[in-house]
Amino acid sequence: MKLKGKGVGKNIVEGEVIVSKKPLSFLGGVDPETGIIIDPDSDIKGESIEGKILVFPKGRGSTVGSYVIYALSRNGKAPKAIIVEEAEPIVTVGAIISGIPLIAGVDISKLRTGMKVRINPRTGEVEIIG
């Protein structure tokens, strides 16, 4: 199955998906030193996003969230890619400055934690491969 959205980035990426059904604030919601979700209200609290394809509806919170995404990247704890239903500037800028491929405008209800996907930010495609 292929899903279509709009992409930012160049590299085709494959990986395991981790899905949150709640909006995510990177500032105070993700530990930039460990890549662990620390937001007490998150449905994926305690999970690591390191090396996974992070899926969530949209970002929320402070503009500092872009720099938290960048810190995750610098610390080697960033997601491999990000898929969101609704693109907003905080997450988009964070992905761009960190070199993390991003696909927006995708119906995330089709994705489940543990699935394997391939994303192509140039075409905006998300392909479920396992």
UniProtKB/Swiss-Prot annotation:
Coiled coil: none
Membership in a protein family: Belongs to the AcnX type II small subunit family.
Associated pathway: Isoprenoid biosynthesis; isopentenyl diphosphate biosynthesis via mevalonate pathway
Record-linked InterPro entries: PMDh-S-like, PMDh-S-like_dom, PMDh_S
Example of a GO biological process term: isopentenyl diphosphate biosynthetic process, mevalonate pathway
Self-association and partners: Heterodimer composed of a large subunit (PMDh-L) and a small subunit (PMDh-S).
Record-linked Gene3D superfamilies: Phosphohistidine domain
UniProt organism field: Pyrococcus abyssi (strain GE5 / Orsay)
Record-given protein name: Phosphomevalonate dehydratase small subunit
Superkingdom of origin: Archaea
The protein's Enzyme Commission number: 4.2.1.182
Keyword Membrane: no
Protein keywords: Isoprene biosynthesis, Lyase
Main function: Component of a hydro-lyase that catalyzes the dehydration of mevalonate 5-phosphate (MVA5P) to form trans-anhydromevalonate 5-phosphate (tAHMP). Involved in the archaeal mevalonate (MVA) pathway, which provides fundamental precursors for isoprenoid biosynthesis, such as isopentenyl diphosphate (IPP) and dimethylallyl diphosphate (DMAPP).
Lyase as UniProt keyword: yes
Gene Ontology MF: a single term: hydro-lyase activity
